[in-house]
Amino acid sequence: MYLSMFYTLLVPCVSILNENFSPTSIMENMSSPATGLQPIRCKAAVCRKPGEPLVMEEIMVAPPMGHEVRIRIICTSLCHSDLIVWKMKDPPGIVPRILGHEAIGVVESVGKDVKEVKEGDTVIPTFMADCGECKDCLSNKSNLCSKFPFSVSPGMPRDGTTRFKDLNGEIINHFLFVSSFTEYTVVDVANVVKVDPTIPPNRACLLSCGVSTGVGAAWRTANVEKGSTVAIFGIGSIGLAVAEGARLCGATKIIGIDINSDKFETAKKFGVTEFVNSGSLGNKSVSEVINEMTDGGADYCFECVGLPSLVHEAYACCRQGWGKTIVLGVHKPGSQLSFDSLDVLHLGKTLIGSLFGGLKTKSDIPILLKWYTDKKLELDKFVTHEMSFEDINKAFNLLIEGKCLRCVMWMNK
């Protein structure tokens, strides 16, 4: 999560715009005759121009359609992917848009076909769907829903339309099926996880994206074994979450690799035991140094930056015979990776991508929350700042300046 947090969420063939998207359809759906629900007028932070401060304004939020849930947001946290898309002038960037995808809230109303949650339930919205019906969701081998695949569409997953408009009637686009920088949002029920309401919301909201991605990559994707050696390329928020996951799995040596030595002190709190400054190795490559430190290679290597060159370095220093390289950061779409075919054949290594840490949202997020209540998963150390939603642009500045890990914003404080 260094070069591009946004691209840590992308897969190589991402769908940018839903072909069914119709700007006029939202104008026809701002009320729901089937349920009698009406639009809600509320406050939102709207991205009006790329890279410029978000505009705090009042918007209208339509009632939920059949399989949708309207949520009152309690608090939301800021992720680098929000920052990256906020700057984008070209697709998948689009304005006006409501960003935000790490949040927790309370169900205000549900569509007529929703059975899974009800009004008053506490829920976490997620950018990953878990429909519970498709072949992928029914399998324990994948967390990639084929019915509602991951996309950066500006609309809802089922019909591509939006549930937001401003007070002038102009449509406002969604982001990652969540759009949490608003007091109320509408999310498909496939992207909603019911959670224990007693868990502090300023901690539970972190599991919508970043922390789950890193911890899950160590736990679910890599299946890190007790006593193993782990190398993490990039120790920003995602890399630190990987370290936390590796610590929970019992790894004994966790090596953090970054160009900023100042990060090591913070990384120690997350379980990182050794540090390598990749910018001060002289004539040696990072992979050479890691191979020397681990007597032949780390059992697990995690690439959390988004540079193809680091994927190669990570693969080069994972142990032959059983080493795994897990890719969490992906460079710009179209970037290529190339490997010597004989190395692939002879070395017995595994290279795998990990979206949302391989977690199934509806079954695995509750497990992570249980680990938190059992004082195993330490969420507190990820939160460096808390503030009012009104100060969201201050939160952006903190992230831009590299002064925060996670900044949580409360809607009513």
Task: Please name every model-derived segment.
Residues 35, 60-61, 94-100, 172-177, ...:
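Short Gly/Pro-enriched turn/cap motifs at secondary-structure boundaries
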Residues 226, 232-235, 247-313, 334:
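Adenosine-nucleotide cofactor-binding segment
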Residues 131-233, 281:
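NAD(P)H dinucleotide-binding glycine-rich loop of Rossmann-like/cofactor-binding domains
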Residues 4, 20-40, 289, 296, ...:
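C-terminal hydrophobic helical "lid"/dimerization subdomain
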Residues 250-251, 261, 268, 273, ...:
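Glycine-rich phosphate-binding loop and adjacent beta-alpha segment
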Residues 62-76, 89-138, 143, 151, ...:
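Glycine-rich beta-strand-centered segment in the early N-terminal region that forms part
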Residues 239-240:
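N-terminal Rossmann-fold NAD(P) dinucleotide-binding loop
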Residues 116-119, 213, 226, 321:
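Short, flexible surface segments
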